[in-house]
């Protein structure tokens, strides 16, 4: 004879089913959130206020700084070199940036062949890079248009083509540095201590 399941067994089954559904929903939310963040990082943001910063990018391999020499790009600039001073504009909600040489006003770009070039107009997506902060505290710059292609240089400061670069290569690792004599001009954020307003006591007048 088939015996009906007890009330306790039914409750246990319902509980297990509920736990399973919660885990599935949580997994879906995590995936959706990761996709949302990735999409926002790659998308243009015309709402947020753009930030413009001035600094140099020190190449780990060449031991020098990236230079924007008009249409030519190299990593042979000394500390404080006028062609190594870069204006970096934060472009999106995520970490997309446009990099312009302060002296030449040409933008650092990567063309469809993976070659680093300077362009006077930086509106093209070829001139947008995704900034990645690595575990070793270096920064890597991946092309926003050509995913997986990075800004990189040889030991002699010559540009590497995008298809030959990888995130874990030292050739694509850079360190942000303020131009010589400019570090002291960068003011840190100041926090203001807010005290509670004391209650104003009105003077009493004799009746």
Swiss-Prot record:
Residues 1-27 form the signal peptide. Keywords: Disulfide bond, Glycoprotein, Growth factor, Secreted, Signal. Gene3D superfamilies: 2.80.10.50. GO terms for cellular component: extracellular region; nucleolus. Its main location: secreted. SMART domains: FGF. Glycans are attached at residues 39, 137. GO terms for biological process: angiogenesis; cell population proliferation; chondrocyte development; chondrocyte differentiation; endochondral ossification; ERK1 and ERK2 cascade; fibroblast growth factor receptor signaling pathway; intramembranous ossification. InterPro entries: Fibroblast_GF_fam (IPR002209), IL1/FGF (IPR008996). Belongs to the heparin-binding growth factors family. Interacts with FGFR3 and FGFR4. This is Fibroblast growth factor 18. It comes from Mus musculus.
